[in-house]
Amino acid sequence: HNTKRGNMRFLLLIVSFFVFAQLTSAQTVNPDYDSTLAKKLGADDYGMKSYVFVILKTGSNTTTDKAFIDSCFSGHMANIVRLVNEGKLIVAGPLGKNDNTYRGIFIFNVNTIEEARKLVETDPAVNSKLLEADLYNWYGSAALPEYLETALKIGKYKIN
């Protein structure tokens, strides 16, 4: 009986050693690692960070008042530009037609859903219930905000 227990402990020790060895060998140091850039972007050891991902969907307001709708969506676009300029919004764009009434996405460069919710509430299309927002914590590359500099240079027409 004690021999079985001793053999199990030995087996567990051997398995633990191999699991630990595998985990530590899987973490190869990146020779291109730039600690200054990683710190500037808020990256963790894997080059990742937390964001808030938002799915915008058709809201409960079914008005057909074109002037009202145009005004709200003009404000929606102006709000997007403002949030991008403040460094809070790093991805925004419409989705193609779909059966889920999903209209677009946002990715906010903030850590909490509460922070993102306050930013979403500044959107006239959301406030008027033309759009509704579902917010999710998302873990992605800390380099994501870096694409904005290039994105602003490749569009022939300015979004305003």
Regions found by a protein language model. Give the residues of each.
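Conserved, structured core segments of small domains
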Residues: Q27-N160
